[in-house]
């Protein structure tokens, strides 16, 4: 480039005389044009090389990203295969009685035969040897202080792993608001407002914050399962069972909030259980006191009460709690959904596609 400018300057200088510019000879014009053409060709070649280099660099980056994604996929598949192999190996070693025991999540009181169990010691160890259950759920009479809860859960988890090689589901009902075994109970955990208030505010960010908060302190204590959030759509205004526990009567809002809260808990290491399928918000009775009834068709429920559950299933929910709720319009029987093959297998598993863990209320 500098050579071209220098030559052009000499040529122009030679054809000037007394301030008057003379006509350039044709030979000089031709030489200048040739130089310009050469420079233009050079620039085009450099641009082409640069473009080609950029394309090659982008291709290399893309190949690296593809390779990285492929390796991540292979690693995930390998880990999944290893996990399946471990499960198969564990099942092969178990007796029928041990396999049946793994299907139960019970209270520590039921496990040991002792009322108000608040520690995991020799009695708990002996009971787990005889009944290696799949999990334990804790209530107010088992909980006394932050330190006591933490030590109890740590010990019982260690016992289970030592005895069966399998960890326990350690569960609690911690919805926040009116149903809270930990927050607001004097363990240094601040209380949380009713979920009805959260739903009424429409504050998705607050719902997510609550999920993170609950998940954080439960995980710190040693729990790994929370029988929450409440995915019931409050479609019966006379319902008092979940009136303050439900996020509201708008199925779409309930679906979004429960999903956000569940995911937030899972980020903290807590499995959330969507409850109470097929929907306690449509009942008037309390299923803890007896059977509760839903007088709706399958289509009606699918288009309303089941929307939060469908959302959760699509988004990867790991656990759903089925209530003792009779849907005679669908099943033609008085069997509660918790014991109904049709409600669990035909609807929840097959029609709705849930492949996670189903637990009863």
What function would you assign to each model-found segment?
Residues 2-33, 39-46, 59-170, 174-184:
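N-terminal hydrophobic targeting/anchoring segments and the immediately downstream early-domain regions
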Residues 77, 89, 110-115, 135-145, ...:
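Second-shell loop/turn segments in exported
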Residues 95, 115-116, 120, 145-164, ...:
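Second-shell residues forming the walls of enzyme active-site clefts
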Residues 105, 137, 226-227, 273, ...:
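Conserved beta-strand positions in the central sheet of alpha/beta enzyme cores
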Residues 109-112, 172-185, 224-234, 274-280:
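Short glycine-enriched loops at secondary-structure junctions
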Residues 113-129, 207-214, 302-308:
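Short, acidic/polar
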Residues 168-211:
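Substrate-binding cleft of extracellular glycoside hydrolase catalytic domains
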Residues 193-223, 228-251, 258, 262, ...:
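A substrate-binding/cap region within the structured catalytic cores of diverse enzymes
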């Amino acid at each position: 480039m500098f050579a071209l400018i220098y030559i052009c300057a000499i040529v122009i200088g030679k054809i000037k005389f007394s301030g008057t510019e003379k006509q350039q000879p044709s030979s000089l014009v031709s030489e200048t044009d040739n130089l310009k053409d050469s420079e233009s060709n050079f620039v085009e070649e450099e641009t082409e090389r640069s473009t080609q280099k950029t394309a090659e660099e982008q291709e290399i980056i893309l190949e690296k990203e593809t390779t990285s994604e492929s390796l991540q996929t292979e690693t995930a598949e390998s880990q999944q295969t290893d996990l399946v192999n471990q499960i198969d190996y564990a099942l092969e070693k178990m007796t029928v009685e041990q396999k049946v025991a793994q299907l139960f999540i019970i209270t520590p009181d039921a496990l040991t035969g002792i009322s108000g169990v608040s520690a995991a010691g020799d009695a708990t160890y002996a009971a787990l040897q005889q009944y290696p259950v799949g999990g334990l759920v804790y209530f107010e009479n088992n909980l006394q202080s932050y330190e006591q809860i933490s030590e109890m859960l740590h010990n019982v988890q260690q016992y289970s792993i030592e005895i069966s090689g399998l960890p326990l589901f350690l569960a609690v009902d911690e919805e926040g608001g009116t149903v809270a075994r930990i927050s607001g109970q004097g363990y240094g955990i601040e209380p949380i407002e009713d979920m009805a208030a959260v739903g009424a505010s429409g504050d998705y960010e607050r719902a997510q914050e609550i999920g993170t908060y609950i998940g954080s302190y439960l995980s710190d204590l040693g729990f790994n399962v929370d029988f929450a959030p409440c995915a019931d759509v409050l479609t019966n205004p006379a319902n008092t069972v979940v009136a303050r526990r439900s996020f509201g009567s708008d199925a779409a809002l309930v679906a979004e909030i429960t999903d956000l809260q569940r995911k937030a808990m899972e980020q903290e290491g807590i499995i959330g259980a969507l409850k109470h399928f097929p929907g306690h918000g449509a009942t008037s009775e309390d299923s803890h006191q007896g059977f509760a009834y839903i007088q709706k068709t399958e289509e009606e429920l699918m288009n309303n009460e089941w929307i939060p559950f469908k959302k959760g299933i699509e988004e990867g929910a790991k656990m759903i709690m089925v209530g003792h709720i009779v849907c005679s319009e669908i099943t033609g029987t008085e069997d509660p959904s918790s014991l109904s093959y049709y409600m669990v297998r035909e609807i929840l598993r097959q029609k709705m596609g849930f492949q996670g863990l189903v637990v009863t209320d």
